[in-house]
């Protein structure tokens, strides 16, 4: 790779796949992990992994214990067109339709739409007097805006109020930052 460094570059696209421009090969990412929820318009249930030849070679030669990152069995099953479990067929049909919808809108338009929504969200958050976790506007994501709720305030009540008054649904964090 251009960095000539043995480290592998892993990218989590769970919140952004299908929402913002992403180029696994062109940007020389080694491992990309994505999911069906969020930008691909589906419920959770499908996972996507893109693996560079560098990452695959590291996998093959590593003597470290593997569990989650053990791609060997899945790669062998893929060669045979076999799933080692009951596939979520309904999600595959949904994914096919979601890809059709994104293609019909055009990815550039999809990305612009997410940018508009993200900017509107940040304007709203600022107007409510709340703090955006990311301090550098140049690093804002157009697929996720993390908002800090001041001590002594109830985030669930805030989300319900925003939904009831502004018809804007906000997700919840997984843990306290």
Each predicted region: which residue ranges?
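Conserved hydrophobic/aromatic beta-strand scaffold that supports enzyme active sites
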Residues: 31, 46-50, 144-146
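Short glycine-/acidic-enriched loop or helix-start segments at secondary-structure transitions
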Residues: 19-22, 43-44, 137
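Conserved active-site segment immediately N-terminal to the catalytic lysine
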Residues: 25-37
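Catalytic PLP-binding core of fold-type I/II PLP enzymes
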Residues: 1-24
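Conserved C-terminal alpha-helix-loop-beta "cap" of PLP-dependent enzymes
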Residues: 126, 130-177
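Active-site C-terminal subdomain of aminotransferase-like
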Residues: 37-123, 127
């Amino acid at each position: 790779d251009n960095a000539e460094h043995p480290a592998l570059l892993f990218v989590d696209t769970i919140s952004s796949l299908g929402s913002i421009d992403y180029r696994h090969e062109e940007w020389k990412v080694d491992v990309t992990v994505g999911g069906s929820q969020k930008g691909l318009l589906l419920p959770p249930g499908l996972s996507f992994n893109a693996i560079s030849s560098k990452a695959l070679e590291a996998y093959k030669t590593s003597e470290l214990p593997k569990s989650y990152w053990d791609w060997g069995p899945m790669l062998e099953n893929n060669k045979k067109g076999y799933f080692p479990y009951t596939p979520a067929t309904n999600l595959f049909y949904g994914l096919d339709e979601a890809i059709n919808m994104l293609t019909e809108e055009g990815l550039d338009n999809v990305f612009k739409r997410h940018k508009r929504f993200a900017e509107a969200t940040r304007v709203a958050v600022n107007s409510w007097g709340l703090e955006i976790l990311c301090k550098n506007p140049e690093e804002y994501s157009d697929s996720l805006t993390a908002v800090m709720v001041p001590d002594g305030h109830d985030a669930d009540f805030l989300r319900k109020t925003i939904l009831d008054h502004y018809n804007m649904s906000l997700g919840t964090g997984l843990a306290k930052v």
